[in-house]
Amino acid sequence: MIYHLISKSCQRLNKPNLINNLIKSQKQSIIYSSSSSSGSSKFISNKYFTTTSNSNNNSNNTTTTTTTTLRQDEIDFFNQQSSDWWNPEGTMKPLHRMNPFRVKYICDRLKIYNEKVSKNPIHLPLEGLNVIDVGCGVGLLTESLSRLGASKVVGLDAAKNNILMAISHASFDQKLNENIQNKSLNYLESTIENFYNIENDQQFDAVCSLEVIEHVDNPKQFIDYLSKIVKPGGSIFISTINKTFLSYISAILGAEYIFRMVPVGTHHWDQFIKPKDLESYFDSNNCQITDLKGLVYNPLTCEWDFTNDLNVNYLLHAIKK
């Protein structure tokens, strides 16, 4: 039984045009080799997060925090995957197919809870908003947020190769490159705690962290920091995988070993997280979950769909009081 991976979603082969056409401008088949980041070492160090450079730089590069949400094994893993991440038919194909659903969910929820979004034009629903994508990877979601008109978009990731690839990919698109030049789109190599310790400000209308929390150390602390950087009345969006028997069958055995949809080792069941645990973490930060929505993937059609079943993948929306 591969539960969500085969069953219900087989009945959903036709997608609404709104979803199929959402983020239509997302690039197809711009595939980079690992050599594309070789000339970009100037991006390695910044005030938020420092690492050892390949150049002869022997300065004291240390982080400023004593505790961290970073798991170095996860960073190493995703650094290795970065060169194939923008290939829509590669190892991240399920994530490419998921992205329009994630964006639709974010826009739909913001339209309900943010007055600016409810009045914005349909093609620029995020106009006037400051948004951050924490754990942005190579920028799949970040680029979409920038295209949809957000005044300020920050893509934050602790994996150096991901940030280099995100900057490189955006530079091939005229609009995104303009956004980088005028600082309305900014990619930073940093952990969430280092970013907060420097900025120390509730500055974002929306904080997004999708398919990330199951890869961090100390998820409670991670939610603490997400809650600190969102404005009162602002939104936090999380997507992750529930910690159930069915999620082990689907997301690990099915996705990694049977269907080979993602590389083996992408997920670890002990790092999956139940909605009730996230609810507790948000409650302790004066935030309230307003919505939970499941996502189901059909490996036969390579398509996602929304569902009310939260046993495997799910999205949530929380509001800071």
Swiss-Prot record:
Keywords: Magnesium, Membrane, Metal-binding, Methyltransferase, Mitochondrion, Mitochondrion inner membrane, S-adenosyl-L-methionine, Transferase, Ubiquinone biosynthesis. S-adenosyl-L-methionine binds at R102, G135, D157, L210. One of its GO terms (cellular component) is extrinsic component of mitochondrial inner membrane. InterPro entries: SAM-dependent_MTases_sf (IPR029063), UbiG_MeTrfase (IPR010233). GO terms for biological process: methylation; ubiquinone biosynthetic process. Pfam families: Methyltransf_23. The lineage of its organism: Eukaryota, Amoebozoa, Evosea, Eumycetozoa, Dictyostelia. This is Ubiquinone biosynthesis O-methyltransferase, mitochondrial. GO terms for molecular function: 3-demethylubiquinol 3-O-methyltransferase activity; 3-demethylubiquinone 3-O-methyltransferase activity; polyprenyldihydroxybenzoate methyltransferase activity. Disulfide bonds: none annotated. Component of a multi-subunit COQ enzyme complex. It is found in: Mitochondrion inner membrane. Pathway: Cofactor biosynthesis; ubiquinone biosynthesis. It catalyses: a 3,4-dihydroxy-5-(all-trans-polyprenyl)benzoate + S-adenosyl-L-methionine = a 4-hydroxy-3-methoxy-5-(all-trans-polyprenyl)benzoate + S-adenosyl-L-homocysteine + H(+); a 3-demethylubiquinone + S-adenosyl-L-methionine = a ubiquinone + S-adenosyl-L-homocysteine; a 3-demethylubiquinol + S-adenosyl-L-methionine = a ubiquinol + S-adenosyl-L-homocysteine + H(+). Its cofactor is Mg(2+).
